[in-house]
Amino acid sequence: MPKETNSNAGGESSSDAASDEYDVIIVGAGAAGVGVAIALVHAGVENFLIVDRDTVGSSFAARPEETKFITPSFPSNSIGMLDLNSIAIGISPAFTMRVEHPTGKQFAAHLQDIANYFELPVEEDTDIKSIEKIDDMFHLGTDDGVLLSKNVIWAAGEYQYPNLAGFEGSDLCRHTSTVPSYGGLEGDDFLIIGGYESGVDAAFHLSANGKEVRLFDMNAPWEETTSDPSVALSTFSFERMRKPSFGQHTELYPNTPVSSVTLDNGVYVLKTEDGQIFESRTQPLLAGGFSGSHKFVSHLFEEREDGFPVISDQDESTITPGMYLSGPSVRHDGHVFCFIYKYRQRFAIVAQAIASSMDIETDDFVDAYKSWGMYLDDLSCCGQECLTC
């Protein structure tokens, strides 16, 4: 079992851990943090700690009340195929929650249950203020002191770091990640900037409530021919767009980049790069995605041209040994690991690298994870398109 601490996912955090040294500290207690922690347990690594500045699954719990997972859950474990939303072998959100498309709050509760079941050592309400490596040890600064670890897995995700830039006046808009419930929004005429999953989700719920929506995107995600949902819309979103209420109340503006948003006498004025002007008395919604938490540790990684961290085949920093990345910010060449069913396949890669550095035998561990499709080390199989028929 993991090393015991003075708190867990259901208890209060303590500053006593500041005097401890760990083999691994995982920053972030979301799907990636909890999932990679379980992989460490299975690999035989015991002396580790998960820290989160809030609570287990808090980013999921903060999603709009109506927002659901676009990836469906199904209890397919009996035939050796993991539920798409599972973060660990033997677990199926569909089975435990009896829900195909869970809400954020439902999945947060699911993560908390898993953390408790595996007795994972979690220090909640622990905000990492700084990370530096001195000699062979990482020093993680908190309000209560310094945590020491030989390895760090950065799994803080993206949701708490919304992208608020992109055009003049973007600060006048409200990011969709800050909306508690679309049903609670005042106004009858909404301008939504960003037509990928978050934008379509917002438009769906608002139009279902009889609100008028104009949805803008610099591209046209709903027209993409690729089968990769990292680029094109999910099947779940396409189905929603075919609902009568969506067609009646939502007007799409593809290939229409927004140049500015201004506020004039209580009226929001949206201008597009091609000169069109749209007005509304309702604050525009910004669905432009997330900048990601990896910016916080940019000094510990080289940077790709797209701004994401450069990582090795083991998802380790190429300039700071022992610093690993896990979760939706993982990139390898053109492959984007932004969904749970994608980035979970890298948990065991990281766990094996750390376990091997501690001289722990990992052959059986790797075989078990490979048998469940949870060990993706051959990226040549990625990027395959579906047949058109």
Where does each model-flagged region fall?
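Glycine-rich dinucleotide-binding loop and its adjacent helix/turn
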Residues: P2, T103-Q106, N151-N209, R304-T318, ...
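C-terminal, flexible cofactor-proximal segment of oxidoreductases
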Residues: P2-T5, S291, F308-C389
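N-terminal Rossmann-like FAD-binding beta1-loop-alpha1 element of flavoenzymes
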Residues: Y22-L49, L191-A208
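Short hydrophobic core segments
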Residues: I25-V27, L147-Y159, I193, E279-S291
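Short beta-strand "acidic-cap" motif of Rossmann-like dinucleotide-binding folds
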Residues: E46-D52, E212-D217
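Glycine-rich active-site loop/strand segments that organize a redox cofactor
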Residues: R53-A108, F216-S234
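A conserved short coil-to-beta-strand element within the FAD-binding core of flavoproteins
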Residues: E124-F138, P254-G266
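A Rossmann-like FAD-binding core segment of flavoenzymes
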Residues: A208-E302, D359-G373
